[in-house]
A protein has these predicted regions:
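Solvent-exposed alpha-helices and their adjacent loops that cap or buttress functional pockets
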Residues: 8, 33-34, 94-96, 119-121, ...
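Active-site segments that bind and position negatively charged phosphate/pyrophosphate groups
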Residues: 200, 204-320
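ATP/NTP phosphate-donor binding region
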Residues: 1-100
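Generic secondary-structure signature for well-ordered alpha-helical cores
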Residues: 92-95, 161-164, 170-177, 185-197, ...
Length: 372
């Protein structure tokens, strides 16, 4: 059964289709929004062998012409050179402003292709077909697009909403356990920031999700997308409430920078650690009971996920150096670093009233005996 989450943004409204076998239905799902029967697809070297043929056969069956560009897999692809390569591909394929381009892949491909679509001819339409759990519940929804800079993650980009999102639950079966759990870090985030009953549901159903229960996976994706859509509609360009979606990300982005955006730490793993540290910081500031971070850590550990900096392999910078890396975060306003803290599970809020010493103590404790 396919479920649809509508994102009501006026003339930029779109639907998120969630269900099994959607890749095989891509022609009938994308066809109605095309001005002409032609699309340009961008994917990566991991996704292409697994899913590109199913997509192109579905498009062909609907009489839709297509061309494909396969980029290297990995975070390093979110860069100027690959953005330039993608735009050259679109221009060579004579993509017009009314045309549609397709992002087939995880968050890296979705972010890159969305940004290319935003700046090509001052904006062309694009469809997200997210192939990772992380992309299905987070990066494919809401219109944030962009690339990384040497100074930090996602510092160059634009808000550009997709015209449609196809979240095929079946493609999640091809993920490694590590990649699935990395995406699960973003799923847990939704329960932690504003939906305690959903977090309870995850405590009960997390094992089934990891084991491949398609019905449970569909429900987790639906609830996550519904929550994100509601927040995006209230605050599309992150002037207020949307910042709540960055729960755990201030810590996460510093950890990603410290590990060189490498496979030492996947984004969703950083989010999971970041959420645990955000709740620990909240407890030390007296904002929430100690029971809250303990419960967060217990669930993440039960799922076999990283919860502390000491879980990251290799040498890490000092707590002071990590705090300095946090200063490159997009949530810095007038030089003031904003944190997403919590009063309880499901009750996150934005504040700049966070003691540097408390954050340093949390970082030091999380590093364990490795703290310098």
């Amino acid at each position: 059964m396919t479920q649809v989450v509508h994102v009501p943004l006026g003339d930029r409204a779109y639907d998120i289709h969630i269900g099994r076998g959607l890749l095989d239905q891509a022609g009938s799902l994308i066809g109605p929004i095309l001005q002409r029967a032609k699309v340009a697809i961008v994917t990566d070297s991991n996704v292409a062998p697994l899913h590109l043929r199913r997509l192109t056969e579905a498009l062909q069956g609907a009489g839709i012409a297509h061309a494909s560009l396969v980029l290297p897999a990995g975070e390093a692809t979110k860069s100027w050179p690959h953005l330039s390569q993608t735009i050259d591909f679109f221009l060579n394929e004579k993509v017009e402003r009314r045309d549609v381009v397709i992002a087939l892949g995880g968050g890296v491909i979705g972010d890159l292709v969305g940004f290319a679509a935003a700046i090509l001819r001052r904006g062309v339409r694009f469809v997200q077909i997210p192939t990772s759990l992380l992309a299905q519940v987070d990066s494919s929804v809401g219109g944030k697009t962009g690339i990384n800079a040497t100074q930090g993650k996602n510092l160059i980009g634009a808000f550009h909403q997709p015209s449609r999102v196809l979240a095929d639950i079946d493609v999640l079966d091809t993920l490694t356990p590590r990649d699935f759990l990395a995406g699960y870090g973003e799923v847990v985030k939704y329960g932690l920031l504003g939906n305690e009953p959903f977090f309870e549901w995850l405590e009960q159903n997390g094992a089934a999700l990891a084991a491949g229960d398609h019905a449970a996976r569909s429900e987790a994706v639906r609830v996550s997308c519904q929550m994100k859509a509601q927040i995006v509609v209230r605050d599309e360009t992150e002037q207020g409430d949307r910042a709540l979606l960055n729960l755990g990300h201030t810590f996460c982005h510093a950890l990603e920078a410290a590990t060189g955006y490498s496979d030492r730490l996947l984004h969703g793993e950083g989010v999971a650690i970041g959420c645990a540290l955000a709740f620990e910081t909240s407890a030390r500031l007296g904002l929430c009971a100690q029971e809250a971070p303990s419960r967060v850590r217990a669930h993440l550990k039960a799922m076999g996920m990283k919860t502390d900096i000491s879980d990251i392999e290799g040498v890490m910078p000092t707590p002071a150096a990590l705090f300095s890396l946090m200063g490159q975060d997009k949530k810095v306003i007038a030089g003031q670093l904003n944190f997403i803290m919590a009063r309880a599970i499901g009750q996150a809020f934005v504040t700049s009233d966070v003691s540097e010493q408390v954050v340093l103590s949390v970082l030091e404790a999380s590093m364990g005996p490795h703290a310098i």
